[in-house]
């Protein structure tokens, strides 16, 4: 059997569930938290809570080699300083691959920081951070990870905020060989999450709660996402977000990379 056929068969095997939507009972397990993670409304809603003793988290029952995963999330309201709410993909092992949405809480009235990163073979250091153009605690909003062999696209309410392309031809690592599981969690990170750890979690406000709904997992290789690219409209929206709401970009951190930006940052396409 040719390498391509083996690869395609593996993709089909890992993507056995194909497309699933909006049923946490079917698609995920509450992995930790001693009852702080709860599946409600016949599998249509999942809540995670955090108190001084523990946070909580859940994970998909299946691993996926490429896919498009949508999740609606309503973040912790009020004074969420010190808390981190997450939605991400991650493979197993010490040289893991990972694609991150991490929502760093803040004091009442201050915006959340959306922290994104991409790891390949255990190496990350590709952080981009954003503020959002809405209050993510007032209503549910859709956060999506599109991961295909050519690119990773992160979107918020169908607006792209980040694209990470496959530049293996330039020697840049890209996650494409290891199936990943979907994870989500709510946990305390007041040693670093808010203003570098200067603002601590106010436990008098506990328990903190984040809500998830309308999970949709499409891992079917013949779907549109498998070859999806950014059209001109999407590129314009991406530039709008990055111009107005990006607050950190590793590509422009000259102190961190005094010898020059990483290779993927210097490409024009």
Swiss-Prot record:
Carbohydrate-modified residues: 106
Binding, xyloglucan: 102, 115-117, 125-127, 191-192, 196, 256
Gene of this entry: XTH24
Pfam families: Glyco_hydro_16, XET_C
Signal peptide: 1-21
Source organism of the structure: Arabidopsis thaliana
Alphabetic keyword roster: Apoplast, Cell wall, Cell wall biogenesis/degradation, Disulfide bond, Glycoprotein, Glycosidase, Hydrolase, Secreted, Signal, Transferase
Tissue: Highly expressed. Predominantly expressed in stems. Expressed in shoot apical meristems, also found in seedlings and meristems.
Intracellular or extracellular location(s): Secreted, Cell wall; Secreted, Extracellular space, Apoplast
Family, as annotated: Belongs to the glycosyl hydrolase 16 family. XTH group 2 subfamily.
Keyword Lipid biosynthesis: no
CDD domains per record: GH16_XET
PANTHER family, per the entry: XYLOGLUCAN ENDOTRANSGLUCOSYLASE/HYDROLASE PROTEIN 8-RELATED
Enzyme Commission number(s): 2.4.1.207
GO molecular function, one term: xyloglucan:xyloglucosyl transferase activity
Name this protein carries in UniProt: Xyloglucan endotransglucosylase/hydrolase protein 24
Active site location: 98 (nucleophile), 102 (proton donor)
């Amino acid at each position: 059997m040719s390498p391509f056929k083996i690869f395609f068969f593996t993709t089909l095997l890992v993507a056995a569930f194909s497309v699933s939507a909006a049923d946490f009972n079917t698609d995920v397990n509450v992995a930790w938290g001693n009852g702080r993670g709860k599946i409600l409304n016949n599998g249509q809603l999942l809540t995670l809570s955090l108190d001084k003793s523990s946070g909580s988290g859940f994970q998909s029952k299946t691993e996926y080699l490429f896919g498009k995963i949508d999740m609606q999330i309503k973040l912790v309201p009020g004074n969420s300083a010190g808390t981190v709410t997450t939605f991400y993909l991650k493979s197993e092992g010490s040289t893991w691959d990972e694609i991150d949405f991490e929502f760093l809480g803040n004091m009442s009235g201050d915006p959340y920081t959306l922290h994104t990163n991409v790891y390949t073979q255990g190496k990350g250091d590709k952080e981009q951070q954003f503020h959002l153009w809405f209050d993510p605690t007032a209503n549910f909003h859709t956060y999506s990870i599109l991961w295909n062999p050519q690119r990773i696209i992160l979107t918020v309410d169908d607006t792209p905020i980040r694209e990470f392309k496959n530049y293996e031809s330039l020697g840049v690592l890209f996650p494409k060989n290891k199936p990943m599981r979907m994870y989500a969690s709510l946990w305390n990170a007041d040693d670093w999450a808010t203003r570098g750890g200067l603002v601590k979690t106010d436990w008098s406000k506990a328990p903190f709660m984040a809500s998830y709904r309308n999970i949709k997992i499409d891992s079917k290789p013949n779907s549109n996402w498998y070859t999806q690219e950014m059209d001109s409209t999407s590129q314009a929206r991406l530039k709008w977000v990055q111009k107005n709401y990006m607050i950190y970009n590793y590509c422009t951190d000259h102190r961190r990379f005094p010898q020059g930006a990483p290779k993927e940052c210097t490409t024009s396409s």
